[in-house]
Amino acid sequence: MKRVVVLLVFFLVSFALYAATVTVVYLDRSETNLEASSYIKKQGKSNKLPHKFSFASKFSALKGDEKVVVILNSGRSSGTDPRISAYLDTVGNKQTIILVNLYSIGKNILSGSVKSANSDFGVDEISAATQWEDRAGDVQAMHKQWTAELFRLIEIKQAL
């Protein structure tokens, strides 16, 4: 019995050490970014994903060897934060990047994705609403939808 417990602990520690890390970059400590980061982490745990999430508040924190980088683009009604655009213009390997656009778009509950081939930046993109006037809409369902798409893209990128 003791050997089984030791072996189980060994496997759990090994799995934790070798779990793939996904870096989430947010440029501002806005309520939207903090909630989105928290939601990603919470949904990752509830879906029992084998990834560890690390969070960075600036691009300079990236080492360059990340397998997957998620960039949160928020605080806008449309378009991309100029700091994100500038960073994406300099990145060599865009295959590792997922851009998550969290827009304030009024009444619409939007959740959609764009493949890298169709993206202006050459990266996979997900767009979702952060707030809307129609409070009758199911907020949790919308957030679950964009995080499910995010996790699907992470799985694909981890396999590359």
For the regions a language model picked out, list residue spans one by one.
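A general structural motif
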Residues: A19, D65-E66, K94-Q95
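Sec-dependent N-terminal signal peptides
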Residues: V4-V13
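Solvent-exposed loop/turn segments at secondary-structure junctions
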Residues: R29-T32, K58-F59, G75-G79, Y103-N108
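A short, well-structured beta->alpha microelement
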Residues: G44-K63
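Short, well-ordered secondary-structure micro-motifs within conserved domains or adaptor modules
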Residues: A61-R76
